[in-house]
């Protein structure tokens, strides 16, 4: 029987600078599979209190860890964890040293945590597997579009000594929902042989879409992905397009203007990096804002915006140029239909 994801796995390994890679249906599944494998005999997993994050939908890392059957060993304080905290916690029942990237929040002030290389050296010395969960992983330098900001990439995590890295194939990678596991070949092969892996496998449609995404990165064509086009959109271009749409809608029974604003990246990532943008602001003359927003949601195609400051707002960063005409038609129709 052929391995349905063999070519994709080689592509992902190349992108991550890893010996091997594999795919499951989301990043939480990737973490659970690692936990079930590495804590099967030695049940404790060590993690800093400052990294016990809550992800979308109200799911908490601590609850995910416990649901896998692992025993959570919290160390350090919320804002301060040292290498000695990790060293003292490692014992005969330690199955895994886990580092979790705080991708959806940040701390500043009196904050400290050991460097990744230090954790990797400690894990190697103590012969404990070291896994890092990046959450919404990014494959290209975030500084290209978020000036002055660094977001850890799978390649650097592995280069600095982690045995395994997990991250999402959607979110900042821009592919379909999936979880990617990359790292040392012996660990990846063991994870693929774990009985629980079959319950987490992706279907062929997801694998195909992820393959297309990975190939664009490998062929230096990531800029053609919708997500990358949105992240790297030039402010001047957004302003020009927004003004063009505002001008085309002149005559509608509403106050329409272009206002400076910020785009939130979303996807559980980069909460402190709003991207400069402008918004198309609409205040209908004779329709309540909530009713106008509801009409747009029912339009063809549906249009989803935000109500803020007593205005209905659209950020054209997230609307591709070839979607501008359908957008304007939907807005015009929403002033007529009920």
Regions found by a protein language model. Name each.
Residues 239-322, 326-327:
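Conserved C-terminal alpha-helix-loop-beta "cap" of PLP-dependent enzymes
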Residues 198-199, 297-304, 332-338:
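A common structural junction motif
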